[in-house]
């Protein structure tokens, strides 16, 4: 009886079940509440069918066909992303970040010309995320491949550009311990960012300066 009552209340709230379904789907996106979802759904109703079809096809194709770079785990249309395939970049300097958004944030500064490594998160026992759930082994393999290719360890730099909260610091320390034996340079951005701030929310000027003025990592 409870389910029937809830269904009846919801159907009375919206003049169309199709509209209700669209609002439910849109509101499932992060940061989108029911009111915003309704506004977006009504906006889509006013658009030409071809525009809406292009919109939905773009999302579907993204989900079905997007790849992750085999080298750095960045989103890519091909097996290797445009950054890793760019010979003008410094491939001996690897900036380690938590997610794809962080790469985009650092790139937007125009101050960094190395390559990246996307971990896919940070160590968080509360959330059930351990080292094996992140791309840490892949990072070690990249460093090992560089040393085996003849690059002097002193010419290899890993920048630990993770968030400054407890989980981010824990992840940075863990990675540092894992790559310490290679004898390479390990650094971190100058702390112009507040404690616990994510790179995504840092302004470009502050973030750019923190990358340029990076310091040796001190556990």
Report each predicted region and the residues it spans.
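Extended interfacial segments that mediate partner engagement and assembly in macromolecular machines
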Residues: 37, 86-161
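Cys/His-rich Zn2+-binding cysteine-cluster or related metal-binding knuckle/ribbon modules and their
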Residues: 11-19, 28, 38-103, 216
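Solvent-exposed alpha-helical segments within well-ordered globular domains of core cellular machineries
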Residues: 20-24, 38-42, 53, 57, ...
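Long C-terminal interaction/binding lobes of large macromolecular proteins
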Residues: 48, 112-113, 140-147, 154-219
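Post-transcriptional modification and biogenesis factors for structured RNAs
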Residues: 8-9, 13-14, 145, 149, ...
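N-terminal amphipathic/basic-hydrophobic helices that include classical n-h-c signal peptides
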Residues: 1-8
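Alpha-helix N-cap/helix-start motif
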Residues: 52, 128-129, 168
